[in-house]
Amino acid sequence: MVNAFLDDMHRPALPYKLKFKVSGCANDCMNSVQRADFATIGTWRDDIKINQDLWKAMVEDKGMDYVVDNITSRCPTSAMKVNADNSLTIDNKNCVKCMHCLNVTSPLTHKYIAKGDVEPILATGDDKGVMIIMGGKRTLKIGDLFGSVVVPFMKMETAEDLEKIEELAGEVIDFFAENALEHERTGEMIERIGLVNFLEGIGIDVDPNMINSTRTSSYVRMDDWDEEAVKWFENKAEANA
């Protein structure tokens, strides 16, 4: 990414700065969601892997109160359930990949791990890629902004995948250069012109998975929801054809 846009960064002809940040997972140690105009964050789209034997060993050792207080009750979408036999069920469709349950259980894995067993208590899925979030910034004209999900999932394994993200970054830079006001960050431009217009300008189709604030609001107008849902399913069918 740096090599592709080094000339633009060295001789910026932009209304204001444009930050790129990359984080390997949703823990986001780079603070990219809060600070980056173009954030690339590692994620996965299949199910969380559960080592039920180690999970049960942890429940037996730590107790149900610990598990509920520190893990399951802190799931932001209440997607975790401990069954009567102390096994764990995760509603993966409602999982928002926040990493909390993995963060809590990861340091405990070594305590319960069997000889030769290398699987952690909980682990990310195998179908990995990145999500792209745009518009994050600290205080300037309109205060702090978190970025909005623009690409919910993109594979990042081949040279072609890298070219796609470079092309998208180029579209964003060009659109920002042509449409942003002086001393205006990407997030402020999106707030001014609307996220739908921004997506059209960079050539990305509207997707119901693009969210502004999880579980509270979506930029997709609900009065046109049925029409937008039909478009999304048609586009998804064409992509899979």
Name each model-derived stretch.
Residues 14-18, 83, 178-192, 209-220:
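Flexible, glycine/charged-enriched surface loops at secondary-structure junctions
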Residues 1-5, 67, 71, 97, ...:
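General structural feature for long, well-ordered alpha-helical segments within catalytic domains
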Residues 199-241:
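Long C-terminal interaction/binding lobes of large macromolecular proteins
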Residues 1-69, 74, 83, 89, ...:
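Small-residue-enriched alpha-helical segments and adjacent helix-cap loops
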Residues 80-86, 110-116:
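Inter-heme linker and motif-flanking segments adjacent to c-type heme-binding CXXCH motifs
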Residues 31-35, 97-100, 190-209:
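Short glycine/threonine-rich loop-to-helix capping motif typified by GTGT followed
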Residues 10-14, 73-76, 80, 100-106, ...:
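Generic secondary-structure signature for well-ordered alpha-helical cores
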Residues 127-128, 136-180:
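A hydrophobic, small-residue-rich beta->alpha segment in the mid-to-C-terminal subdomain
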